[in-house]
Amino acid sequence: MSRIADTFARLRAAGRTALMPYLMTGYPERDSVLDLAPALEDAGADLFELGVPFSDPLADGATIQRASERALANGVRLEHCIATIAVLRERGVRAPIVPMGYYNPFLQYGLARLARDMAAAGADGLIIPDLPPEEAQECHAACREYGLDLIFFVAPTTPDERIARITALASGFIYCVSLTGVTGARRELWSGLPAFLERVRRHTTLPLVVGFGISSADHVREVGRHAAGAIVASALINVIEQSHPGEYVARAAEFVRLLRG
């Protein structure tokens, strides 16, 4: 059983919703994640989505775009992201770590090499928002060879036949986008979310994890009524962005504790 599958099985048995914070590698400082991830795990994070900075992050809203730009300015590239995961494992972080990055840097690095190096560092999967299932065969094969889960997005606008195609390739969990458009914190969840998740569930037994727009403990509780987990990205990056340099780790951990409830 993979570390991701084991985590969801354990949380399901405990009746808990998985909380998956998003951190950008290299933000706000080059090695901030080395302090943030252990603190957030202690505060109640169950898994991590770890952003790989990219110059044109099409799926991301303004908050994560700013974080990506800052990380790039800090000199962070894919190799540093892989090295960061290895250091986190050396420092005792046990939660699954799933890097999220765009396809072009991964392709340039080499997909087999990427899967090998990510797995060796201690990553558990890959999220590639601009990789359609029709073009995912090579990446899927590389991930399978090295024991990584390949995570795909489904959105409210995704037709049923495409959901079936995506879920046939996916492993680990299904990333269910809670709204149309780019990432960003929202005040209220979409009222159609339960029906959308039920539609996805007809095609898979994998855990459903909801992202985009989740920003409060109430959101996490509501998502937990219908899905296995919740991803909190822009709201957490906002907390870090609005903190003084010496305070962002403590404030981020406090926010995760509030989300956990």
Swiss-Prot record:
Disulfide bonds: none annotated. Pathway: Amino-acid biosynthesis; L-tryptophan biosynthesis; L-tryptophan from chorismate: step 5/5. InterPro entries: Aldolase_TIM, RibuloseP-bd_barrel, Trp_synthase_suA. Its EC number is 4.2.1.20. Keywords: Amino-acid biosynthesis, Aromatic amino acid biosynthesis, Lyase, Tryptophan biosynthesis. The active site is at 49 (proton acceptor), 60 (proton acceptor). GO terms for molecular function: tryptophan synthase activity. Pfam families: Trp_syntA. It catalyses: (1S,2R)-1-C-(indol-3-yl)glycerol 3-phosphate + L-serine = D-glyceraldehyde 3-phosphate + L-tryptophan + H2O. It comes from the Bacteria. One of its GO terms (cellular component) is cytosol. The alpha subunit is responsible for the aldol cleavage of indoleglycerol phosphate to indole and glyceraldehyde 3-phosphate. Tetramer of two alpha and two beta chains. Belongs to the TrpA family. This is Tryptophan synthase alpha chain. It comes from Roseiflexus castenholzii (strain DSM 13941 / HLO8).
